[in-house]
C-alpha cells in the first residue's frame, strides 16, 4: 500500500486578519473545510503554516509531497513565498481561492502553480483535485527531464 501524501497547507498570515472581519471568518471556514477534506480523504496533513520568510526551511524539514495554498487577500505574497520555497525541491502546488481574475490565474500558473481551483472547496472534491494535480505535476516533470 502506498504511503499517503504528506501535505503542507499554506494559510493567510493570521496577523493580517482583523478579528470580527466577515471575510476573514469565511476564509477561516474554508481553511477548516480544506483540512477536514484532506484528513477524510486519507492525506497526511503534516502542517499548516503561514507564508513567511521561514517557509523554505520549514518545507525542507517537513519533506512535504505537495503544497496547498489557501489564501485570499495576500495570495500573491503567499504564492511568492511558496514558489521561492519550492524552487530547489520542486513539488506540486495547488491553490484554492475565490479569485477568478484571469490575470491572477495566468500569473499563478506561470509562477508554477499546478492547479488553480476557484470556489471548489467541497470536501468531496479535494481528493480528485489533488489526484489530477499530482498527475499533471509528474507529467510536467517528465517533460522537463
What are these regions (language model features)?
Residues 103, 121-130:
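C-terminal output helix
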Residues 67, 90-100:
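A short, hydrophobic beta-strand element within the central beta-sheet of small alpha/beta folds
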Residues 20, 26-31, 51-57, 65-84, ...:
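Conserved phosphotransfer microenvironments
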Residues 135-145:
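CheY-like receiver
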Residues 60-62, 84-91, 111:
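Conserved phosphotransfer cores of two-component systems
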Residues 14-48:
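Two-component/phosphorelay signaling modules centered on CheY-like receiver
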